Amino acid sequence: VAMQQPDAVVIGSDQVADLHGRPLGKPVTHERAVAQLRMMRGQTVVFHTAVAVVCRNSGFEAVDVAQVSVTFRDSDTGMSDADIEAYLQAEKPYDCAGSAKSEALGIALLARLQSDDPTALVGLPLIKTVSLLRAAGVPVLAGATA
């Protein structure tokens, strides 16, 4: 995109979940989502969300990564097999790392979140993104109105 639009400020982001050193990406299928959620039940999973900002004309390129530690509920506190199935049928988060959307019904599966940039859990670390945009010389609040 940056090659085709050299005047543009290009932002890219992606995420992977890390369960004790094991990467958990996007499940794609229902069966893989069930397996991921069962593995994460009662566990703390670290979600790594990267953001990159590229401004081709100015030569600015930077990347940063935000981590969010997420503790999932266990089977006694809201993450039984029936809870997992009900959640997946309702939301179908098969394109989300870790099989859960914290910005929607997936929050019901979570017991605790910890991060310097909690927006990273939804797929774009906004605090880090703003820092990168400012470093690139983008006037983030220019033209802002109440």
Question: Predicted segments — roles?
Answer:
Residues 1-146:
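Anionic-ligand binding patches
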